[in-house]
Each structure stands twice: as structure tokens, then as C-alpha cells.
Amino acid sequence: MSRTRGVALALTVAVLAPLPACGGAMGGGGAKSGAASDQIGAPAPDFSLAPVGGGSAIGPRSFAGKVLIVDFWATWCAPCRQSFPVYQHLLEKFPGQVAVVGVSVDDAPDGIAKFQSETGVHFPLVWDQGQSVAGAYKPGTMPTSFVVDRSGIVQKIHEGFHQGDEAALEQEIRSLL
């Protein structure tokens, strides 16, 4: 292999290797990893974390009676940034019927409040220090969202996020109301 080809191959690998860690493949139907798919039909794992910026600790039980989206995300994840305005729009479209909790898996909470401000969302963001909540849910990539029905049962899992996924989420929410 020539030196030029070797460098080109190394650059290609360096650029493409991180992609599965942030983005995944949702494809409209909500692809899910094997570990996460075990959650479908089971009660959403409970947790109790304080929102970044203050307030009382929250978790799935805090939103009983509402359709809940538990979204695992990170500040370094570009598809996460795209998904947040969609979640905010869904909250506004279904007032009082839907809730969203963003669970950050970042190593430190430093950029979470800034991320929330930049994306313009008003739903609570919590920091999963030590990633114990992520360990219970087992998200396969960032972002991964778990759609939980009004009884607290995980009904759907979405890995990754692409423009256009809002329609699938809206349809799922309507079916659970």
C-alpha cells in the first residue's frame, strides 16, 4: 500500500469511527440495540435526579399519567442538538399530556445548562453522574429515547435522530394518549 493510500485510509477511519457513538440509525421505525430492546414492555427503570439548574429530584414516577420521553444525550452529540427542538415542539403540541426528561451522560455537568439555553428547550435536563441511569436503560448510542406510556411501561425505543423523525414520534404519542 502506498503512503498516500495509507494516510487516506487512516483519515477515513478517524472520521467515520466516532459516528456510531453519536447518531445511530433510527430509520423512522425506531431501531434498537439488543440490550435496550429488553426494556420494551417492561416498566421504565426508575431514577431520581435533580434537574441541572436546581429544583426537586425527578424521575419517571414524577410524570405518571403522561406519555414520557426519557432521552439519553450528550453535549458533544450533534444529532442530540437536532432532537431537542423536536421534543420541545411535541411538548407544546400535547400540553399536559407529554413530558420529556433529558438524561445527560456527559462526564461533567459543565456544559449542560449552556446546551439547554442554546437549544431553547424548557424540559428538565438531569446529569447522570456515574451513568447509573444509563446502566439501567442501556442506550445503544447517543441519542437514544425511550417512549414510556402513561402507566410507566416502555413502549418504543429510538436510537439516533434524523430530521423527519418527528412524525414517527408524534404518531407514537397519539397512539399512547
Outline where the language-model segments fall.
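N-terminal targeting signals for export/organelle localization
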Residues: 1-50, 156, 167-177
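A short beta-strand-turn-helix
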Residues: 38-41, 46-68
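Active-site acidic short loop of glycosyltransferases
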Residues: 64-66, 96, 121-122, 139
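Short pre-active-site segment immediately N-terminal to redox-active cysteine/selenocysteine motifs
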Residues: 66-68, 72-76, 141
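Hydrophobic beta-strand core positions in alpha/beta domains
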Residues: 69-71, 102, 146-147
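Structural microenvironment flanking redox-active thiols in thiol-disulfide oxidoreductases
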Residues: 81-119, 129-136
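Thiol/disulfide oxidoreductase modules built on the thioredoxin-like
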Residues: 114-122, 128-175
